[in-house]
Amino acid sequence: MGNNVFDVLKERGYIKQTTHEEEIRDLINKDKITFYIGFDPTADSLHIGHFLPLMMMAHMQKAGHRPIALVGGGTVRIGDPSGKSEMRKMLSKEAIDKNVSSIKSQISRFIDFSDDKAILVDNADWLLNLNYLEFIREIGVHFSVNKMLTAECFKQRLEKGLSFLEFNYMLMQAYDFLCLNRKYGCVMELGGDDQWSNMLAGTDLIRREESKSAYAMTCTLLTNSEGNKMGKTVNGALWLDKDKTSPYEFYQYWRNVDDADVEKCLALLTFLPMDEVRRLAALEGNKINEAKKVLAYEVTKLIHGEDEAKKAEEASEALFGAGKDMSNVPTVNISKDDLGKGILDILVETKILPSKGEARRLIQQGGLSINEEKVTDINMAVTEDLFEENSIIIRRGKKSYNRIVIE
């Protein structure tokens, strides 16, 4: 690779903080290193917030470095307090195992694990059977409680209450880095910027225990031009699993980003060359929509594959452009027995909306249409006369569409 990958990551806007910028630049330019990123399996899918670290990981792998993807099957039993205002609910072992399995398969879509090019580990393998006394003697001795209490991840929790369980999280994450350093020669941790305190603890532990240098580099959080987190939809998070967020809904999210966010999203969420990113971002007026189409297609292709990206693009064209093929618009089926039911029941039973409260609110705010006719009555019945060619088109907000078909 001609460019130093550090400069590539910097130019594209990934890097937020580093422990030793010049040392890291030299290290990843001149040597091939092993680095890791951790993913806690708190849900059965990764979401768009995890995608930036995954992209960072992919850029590093393309430059010849070896990634370790660590799934936190052990640490998730504690719960990371970073950025959380209250304690997370504890997950059952079965739920954790299911989540770990799903996340491992998702990571494999972005990272090449063939021929030892990358390693996938679960920290449950070394955390579950830790001897508490040995751990406290070997690891705990290096941690100053006074210093830990000044860490950003604990500050906001001290007033509301921080359990001893969660207070241990920093030690566990630092210990992960030490284990990976000892077993695989891992010298760098990458992660979200909310992990900075935990990552510094790991580099410090390796320095004290192994008398070696270790490094940390954080990834910027995905925010819009106003500084708000991106990736929220009416149905919650923007998931990478197509059963939780359909490829069409995913595509439409990026198709509808603000003009001011196009360049940032193209740089962070695609592999398009930066010259092309700048060219697309410089388009003005209606032409910026072409850049948004490219963004939506490229990101959807990376997450869901080329076929799903094409289908989502065609569905979008059918609804907003000159296309007439509605077959790729997200479609749900109802039976003739469902005819006559209320609109709220239909919307929830078909999973177009997550709850009747959400559906009621949307209608009251004037945000729901059937066949481009605004729905004003929350008690309206869905009857056969509404259907044209056996289907109706539901529009939520300005640009979220679903088709309902009678089986």
Curated annotation (Swiss-Prot):
Span of the annotated motif 'KMSKS' region: 229-233
Record-linked SUPFAM superfamilies: Alpha-L RNA-binding motif, Nucleotidylyl transferase
Highest taxon of source: Bacteria
Binding sites annotated in the UniProt record for L-tyrosine: Y36, Y169, Q173
GO biological process, alphabetically ordered: tyrosyl-tRNA aminoacylation
Oligomer status and interactors: Homodimer.
Main location: cytoplasm
GO molecular function ontology, one term from the record: RNA binding
Transmembrane segments: none
Keyword flag RNA-binding: yes
S4 RNA-binding domain span: 341-407
Taxonomic lineage: Bacteria, Bacillati, Bacillota, Clostridia, Eubacteriales
Known role: Catalyzes the attachment of tyrosine to tRNA(Tyr) in a two-step reaction: tyrosine is first activated by ATP to form Tyr-AMP and then transferred to the acceptor end of tRNA(Tyr).
Organism: Clostridium tetani (strain Massachusetts / E88)
Catalytic activity: tRNA(Tyr) + L-tyrosine + ATP = L-tyrosyl-tRNA(Tyr) + AMP + diphosphate + H(+)
Binding-site residues, ATP: K232
EC identifiers of the protein: 6.1.1.1
Localization (cell): Cytoplasm
Name this polypeptide is given: Tyrosine--tRNA ligase
Entry GO CC: cytosol
UniProt short sequence motif 'HIGH' region, positions renumbered to this chain: 41-50
NCBIfam families (UniProt xref): tyrS
Family: Belongs to the class-I aminoacyl-tRNA synthetase family. TyrS type 1 subfamily.
Record keywords, A-Z: Aminoacyl-tRNA synthetase, ATP-binding, Cytoplasm, Ligase, Nucleotide-binding, Protein biosynthesis, RNA-binding
